[in-house]
Amino acid sequence: MNNLRVIMSVLLAVLVFTATVSESAEEMGKGEVTISLRCKTKTECLKNIACEACVDCRCDKGICKCHGFTAETNNPTV
């Protein structure tokens, strides 16, 4: 009887682990995130992780640069 409990708990743990991993894999595949700051077009900057909080991210001379953050537009400090 003890073996049955162990088998059932291991099976349940494997099912929960599999469901969690597959859900995480789906979320990771939703959008591509670029870590490099190099760019050729503005759309490459929009996928960049450094420009997530940026309101106006531009590709200046091959490098993504932020020209304004969300916090600055919502709560101006000046």
Curated annotation (Swiss-Prot):
Residues 1-24 form the signal peptide. The keyword Secreted applies. It comes from the Eukaryota. It is found in: Secreted. Keywords: Antimicrobial, Disulfide bond, Fungicide, Plant defense, Secreted, Signal. GO terms for cellular component: extracellular region. Coiled coil: none annotated. This is Defensin-like protein 287. It comes from Arabidopsis thaliana (Mouse-ear cress). The lineage of its organism: Eukaryota, Viridiplantae, Streptophyta, Embryophyta, Tracheophyta.
